[in-house]
Structure formats: C-alpha cells, structure tokens
Regions:
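Repeated loop/turn-to-beta-strand initiation elements of outer-membrane beta-barrel proteins
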Residues: 2, 47-51, 98-101, 151, ...
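Surface-exposed, low-complexity loop segments enriched in small/polar and acidic residues
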Residues: 3-184, 197-199, 204, 249-289, ...
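Transmembrane beta-strands of outer-membrane beta-barrel pores
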Residues: 8-12, 57-63, 96-98, 107-111, ...
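Residues that define the transmembrane beta-barrel architecture of outer-membrane proteins
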Residues: 31-35, 82-86, 129-133, 178-186, ...
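Outer membrane beta-barrel strand-and-loop segments of large Gram-negative receptors
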Residues: 34-36, 136, 291, 315-422, ...
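Residues on the lipid-exposed face of transmembrane beta-strands in outer-membrane beta-barrel proteins
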Residues: 39-43, 90-94, 135-141, 186-192, ...
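C-terminal beta-signal and adjacent terminal beta-strands/loops
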Residues: 398, 402-466, 486, 533-542, ...
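C-terminal beta-barrel architecture of Gram-negative outer-membrane proteins
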Residues: 409, 413, 418, 426, ...
Length: 629
C-alpha cells in the first residue's frame, strides 16, 4: 500500500492595532506559508511479516513585526524565519514461533534560520540544525504457563541520538552551540496472572500484575532507572479496578542543559511588586547545573459498564504525583519567587529592568487530583462489516511494549487521556484541541493560535468516530469528565515557604485552576457527521503582595466540526465523480470568542493581560477540502 499527501497553508498577519492594542508596527500573529509532503509504503513480506517506510518534508516561511525602529528608519522591525524538517521512519514486524518481534528506526533533521532587525538598523542572524536518530528492537510473548494463565514478557533494547548546532550573530558578537546526547536503553515488562476462574484459581474475577523496569544512560548525564507495577482486577465483565505505582528518573533536556544564552529586549512583563506592566530584557538559555528529576506516581482507577444501560461506561481515577528536583523554566516573578531567586532579578530604582529566565530546579512538587465521568455511545441503522485491512482484516499490533516505552503509568483504566496527569500542567491551560489528536510532528496549537506547520488540528475526526471502519449505519457518542485538583504545591528550595498554587501562588502564567470540565461528543451517519467539544476551567488568583492580587476569571470554550465523507456517499459520487475520494470539513474553534479576563485589585485589566495578548486569534473558522487520488 502506498499513500502520498501534499498540502499548502497560508496565514495572514494579525497586528496589535487590529485588537486595539497600543503598540504600533508590532504583530500578534506572524504571516506564514507552510508546505508539506509525506508518503507511506506498507509491504507484506510474507504471511507473518510486514514492513513499512514513511517520509515527510515540511517547510514554513514566516514574517513578524517587532515594533517601530525609533532610532533609525521609523519603519517596523522585521523578523524573517524559515524552518525545514525532514523525518523518516522504518519498521519491520513479524512472528517468531509464538513470539512477536518488531524492529524500528527513525531519523529527523530540523533546520532553522532567523533574521531579526534591531533598533538603529542592525541585523541579527540565528541558525540552527538538530538531528535526531535512533531505533529499537522488541520481542514479546508467552514465557510459560502460570497457575492462572500464561506469563507474558516483553523486552526492548533501544538507542537514541541527538545533535544540535547553532550560531548566533549579533553585530561583532558570535555565539555558537554544539550539543550532543547518545542514550542507550533497555526496557522490560512481565505480566503475571494471579487469579482466573477459567483456571480454577479464585472465584473473584481475573487479577494480574505487570512489573516493568527501565535503565538508560545519557552520554551527558548520569545513569537513570525507572520501575513500576500495575495491578488489573477484572471483578466482573463490567467492573474493573486498576492500581499502579511508578518510580521514575528523568534527565533535563539537552537544550535545558546547554542552550546558548540569548537576550531579548523590550519584553512586556507585569511586575507584581509595583502593579505595573514594564518593558524588560530577558535572558534565556541553558543551565549546566540542573539535576535529574525523580518522580513518584500513584494511580487508582475504577471502570464500570452498567449492564442495564448498553454503551455506558463510568470511570473514576485518582492520581498523585510527588517529584523532586524538577527542571522548569523560570517561573512567574511573584514576590515569593523573587525572594527565592534574588540573583535572577535586576531592578534600577525599584523598577524591574531584567530577568534571568534560564531553567531552574525546584526542590519538590506535589499534586493530586480526582477525575470522574462517563462515556456513552451507540450504533444505529444497518451496519456494514469493516473493510479488510492488510492480510487479516485487522490492524496488526506492533508488539507488546514495542518502541520506546512511554513514561506514563503502566496501565490504563479505560478513561480518555487526562490533562495534567503526572506532571502538573501550568498556567491557564490550553484551548481544547479539535476533534482528533494532532499527527506526529504536526504543530500543536498553543497560545495565540495554530502551531507552525500543516495538520495541527487533525483530520476531522473520521477515524476517531468510526474506528477506521466504513459503515452504512451511524453512531453517536458523548463523554463528560470532571477533574478536581486536590493539592498542587511547589517547594522552591530549603528554607523557602512552600507555594500553594491553588491558593494564591503561581509558577506559570497564572494560578492553578481547581476545576476542569470537559464535554465531547459526535454523530456520524452515512458519510455525514458532526463533532463538538467544550471545556470549562475555573478561575484562579495570584497573590501580588503590596500591589494587590491578580484575578484570573473562569473560561468556557466551545468547538464544533461538520464533515462529509464522500467515499460513503456512492449516489453523490456517481452524479459528481470529482468528489470521489474527497472529504469536506467545516471547523469553528472557540465558537463564542470567549477570552479569559484578568483584573488587578482595582478591577483594571493590566496591559500585559489584555485579551489581545492572551488569545489574539479568538474565534477561528476553517473550511477544508481533502481529496485522495
């Protein structure tokens, strides 16, 4: 099977003046052109062996304006950039007796070139190249028959490498960076059934335990180990419990350790000490003295599908994380943070003029939360059997534990992915993504709008709604989940008061929101469908000392998708053949143009927190037509 895709996306510039903001000649969102082409080849070598190869190239050219050149021409200062990315991966998997094996390899090359105009007519240049490569081999299968069923094992050996080179030219000053990391690793897991009525062992359902461990040795850091255990207890066919614990070590990233220092001038920043928004100089880069992070994660979960209500699944999860020596970007400069890092802050006559924002280690962070809710969905109408995929009509798994093992808990309780699980999500939280998760390598949508690159919002939900099947009937689905943060605390260092992020302290762009409600649903019938999603998170408060507090208001956002898959409308394609192989999608993000309101103690919105700065894009409408040839 061969699949080739190509695309182009053009975005116009959004100026501050279009959002009634005071700075002339400065853009909120850059203008850009993005191009992408990718292809995939899947080949059956024999009855039990399959190979695949995928390649992708994308390029993005962008232009942003940084304000007027008040010391020179008086024209807007420009920043021109070009990024190019080439990625490739290959895999082969098959069977060796009763054991499944898989071998994968990957390579990526990311190049970036940036020209920035400065006051007085000077021009800076920054270019960088990052190469990532690696591979792994996995084998998994049944080791032996235990007293309650077969004992299964999975072993993965892997290697990953990274090379990063950059050069920064500022006048006669030239700064270069040359970073490298090689990381061999080994991962193993063992699943042991403990109870199973089918084997006449116990009469209280099926109970199993999965033990896992990992060791890796980054070339620029000390050896790291991880281990964990997961208990799965299927009490009945409709009721299951999960408990897992993971002890994990993680090294700071290469850039956190060794990125070249870079100063950025004229950055708008809210000073909690004075209650004013000021223009400052920030210093970013790496910190070679960062320590390894140690994480302790506990998860308890329950899933229940009431037999009296078909298609309904209820779930509740409890997550607790305690981490030591967490590597973080420099936090929001509240009075508490300034007292903990006085050497990182420069003031002249009490006025904030500069901050050293290079990464730091927090001594300890602890957080816990409960997430509960339901999934409800049913099929209706006449169903068509799934079309065959590959040789056997089903997607071939890549082997138990294939690939680099994730750092998440060693099991899932069946609920959709949770935001903020394990590591804490900072700040206000991101706007809900679209109807499907972005593809690998696609630009994720961050503050201010879509990420760079094509495909950042996913394909429109066809696969997610239909599970890869083509159906003549229909299906509807809805889920509602509520997350409640119980604790969220950070200890910056010994002798410094602990920060309670749920009660006035902050490390990110705002406080920590205690409540998060997520609604998701959709309807699909004979090629036509819609998806909707909504998210509400409660507000927060940041204690500002003598300047007063900042209040971050509640925020509710709604997204909706309408789509048509003409592959499932034979009568339409017979009359209009050019629609064969095409899909049409209308997307509206942030349907009601909701924006978080931030006010100080006097009810005034600080300049740095104007809605145009927090979310310059607002409502986003997109019409997309895709056609396969």
């Amino acid at each position: 099977r061969v699949n080739i895709n190509a695309g182009w996306e053009h975005k116009t510039m959004l100026m501050e003046s279009e959002r009634d903001l005071p700075v002339a000649g400065r853009s909120l969102l850059s203008a850009s052109d993005a191009y992408v082409i990718d292809g995939t080849i899947v080949q059956n070598i024999d009855k039990v062996t399959e190979a695949s190869l995928s390649l992708r190239f994308d390029q993005t050219d962008s232009l942003s304006l940084l304000g007027l050149d008040t010391l020179g021409s008086g024209q807007p200062l420009r920043r021109d950039s070009r990024s190019q990315n080439l990625t490739g991966s290959a895999s082969v998997n098959g069977m060796l007796g009763d054991w499944r094996w898989a071998v994968t390899g990957n390579y990526s090359d990311a190049d970036s070139l940036i020209f920035t105009e400065r006051l007085g007519g000077t021009r800076e240049r920054f270019d960088s190249t990052q190469q990532s490569f690696g591979g792994n081999a996995n084998i998994s299968g049944s080791v032996m028959d235990g007293w309650a069923g077969p004992i299964r094992a999975s072993i993965t050996g892997g290697y990953s490498g990274l090379r990063f080179d950059s050069r920064s030219e500022r006048g006669i000053a030239v700064t270069t960076t040359d970073l490298a990391r090689d990381t061999p690793s080994v991962f193993g897991s063992l699943t042991i059934p403990l109870l199973d009525p089918d084997y006449n062992v116990g009469n209280v359902g099926r109970l199993s335990v999965t033990l896992n461990g990992q060791a890796e040795r980054p070339s620029d850091f000390s050896a790291l180990t991880s281990w964990g255990a997961t208990f799965n207890w299927g009490i009945t066919g409709n009721l299951s419990l999960l408990a897992s614990y993971k002890n994990d070590e993680a090294a700071p990233s290469v850039s956190q350790l060794g990125a070249a220092p870079m100063e950025t001038q004229n950055v708008s920043y809210y000073d909690f000490a004075t209650g004013q928004t000021v223009e400052i100089t920030t210093l970013t880069g790496g910190n070679p003295f960062l320590r390894a992070e140690q994480r302790r994660d506990l998860k308890l979960g329950l899933n229940w599908s009431p037999p009296m209500v078909e298609g309904l699944r209820l779930s509740i999860d409890y997550n607790r994380n305690k981490s030591y020596d967490t590597a973080n970007g420099f936090p929001l400069l509240t009075p508490e943070i300034e007292a903990a890092f006085p050497g990182r802050v420069t003031r002249v006559g009490g006025v904030l003029v500069a901050i050293d924002q290079r990464p730091v280690n927090f001594d300890r962070s602890t957080n816990s939360q409960i997430r509960w809710g339901f999934n409800f969905g049913k099929s209706f109408g006449q169903q068509q059997q799934p079309q065959a995929q590959g040789r056997s009509g089903e997607r071939r798994p890549q082997g138990e534990g294939a690939g680099r093992p994730p750092r998440a808990e060693g099991g899932e309780s069946g609920a959709p992915p949770q935001g903020g699980e394990g590591r804490r999500a900072g700040g206000d939280g991101a706007r809900p993504v679209g109807d499907a998760a972005p593809s690998a390598g696609a630009g994720a949508r961050g503050p201010g709008g879509p990420g760079g690159g094509l495909g950042g919002r996913g394909p429109g939900g066809f696969g997610r709604m239909m599970g890869g099947q083509q159906q003549q009937g229909g299906r509807w689905q809805m889920s509602l989940y509520h997350t409640v943060k119980l604790t969220d605390k950070v200890l910056i260092g010994p002798g410094v008061p602990e920060l309670d992020l749920l009660n006035g302290s902050a490390t990110g762009s705002g406080g920590s929101n205690r409540h998060l409600v997520e609604l998701d649903g959709g309807l699909f019938y004979r090629g036509l469908g819609t998806r909707f999603s909504a998210k509400y998170d409660s507000g927060s408060r940041v204690t500002g000392g003598s300047a007063g507090d900042l209040k971050f208001g509640d925020l509710a956002t709604f997204n909706i998708r309408f789509f048509a898959d003409f592959n499932q409308m034979p009568k339409v394609t017979e009359n209009m053949p050019f629609l064969k192989g095409s899909r049409l999608r209308l997307s509206i993000d942030n349907l009601f143009d909701a924006q978080r309101k931030v006010t100080d103690a006097n009810g005034i919105v600080p300049l740095n927190y104007y809605p145009g700065y927090i979310d310059p894009l607002g409502r986003y409408v997109e019409l997309e037509w895709r056609k396969s040839f």
